[in-house]
């Protein structure tokens, strides 16, 4: 596991332009956690050491505390990977775009279809419509807004977000440049969903572990004194 961890960190560092030593360490740590967790489970069920039927029997008979620990450690590995990727490899693009123009980031193409004024219940908004494609996949639509509330005249920026298993896409529209264009901000934040998946796995693993009766701490049971009449009868 240690050799694979070091190799994984080295490959990650060499393949990604923006990688740093800290990011490579984070990915290596997540790989080490995951491999160690799987190796420990394999040892408990004697995988490749006993006949498959015996390993399968041990697999099915693992206590809840064991499954909870495995799930929690696996969740920690996933969360560390998500935290590292989202911190080190976020891609941001800020530019002025006109309707019909396209900007590419991280393999995604953002095409600004239109910008129009819309009326909300208590605000007016400038709404941009982006068509997003990747390769030959069907496009999706992101519609960020810049809102101005009627009474308070307060302005807010409403980002449009699309989540995938590999990361989140963000689109933000800003002020016009006076020449038919609008300031836009486009982001790709990788592996953000892994943070939530990892956190959920850790919480679920803790709950499963605590459900194991062997790990419950309860009040000592009270032993009943023998009935005096019964003692006399036996005597």
Identify the function of each model-found stretch.
Residues 1-235:
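Solvent-exposed, non-transmembrane regions of integral membrane proteins
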């Amino acid at each position: 596991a240690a050799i694979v961890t070091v190799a994984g960190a080295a490959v990650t560092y060499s393949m990604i332009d923006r990688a740093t030593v800290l990011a490579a360490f984070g990915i290596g740590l997540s790989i080490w956690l995951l491999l160690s967790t799987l190796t420990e489970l394999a040892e408990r069920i004697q995988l490749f050491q006993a006949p498959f039927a015996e390993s399968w029997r041990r697999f099915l008979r693992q206590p809840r505390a064991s499954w909870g620990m495995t799930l929690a450690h696996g969740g920690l590995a996933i969360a560390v990977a998500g935290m590292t990727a989202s911190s080190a490899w976020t891609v941001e693009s800020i530019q002025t775009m006109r309707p019909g123009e396209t900007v590419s980031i991280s393999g995604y193409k953002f095409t600004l279809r239109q910008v129009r004024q819309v009326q909300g219940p208590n605000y007016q908004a400038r709404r941009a419509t982006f068509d997003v494609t990747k390769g030959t996949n069907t496009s999706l639509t992101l519609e960020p807004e810049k809102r101005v509330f009627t009474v308070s005249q307060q302005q807010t920026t409403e980002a449009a977000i699309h989540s995938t298993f590999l990361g989140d896409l963000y689109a933000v529209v800003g002020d016009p440049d006076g020449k038919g264009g609008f300031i836009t901000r486009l982001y790709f934040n990788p592996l953000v969903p892994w943070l939530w998946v990892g956190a959920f796995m850790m919480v679920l693993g803790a709950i499963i572990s605590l459900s194991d009766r062997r790990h419950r701490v309860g009040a000592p049971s009270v032993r009943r004194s023998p009935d005096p009449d019964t003692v006399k009868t036996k005597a």
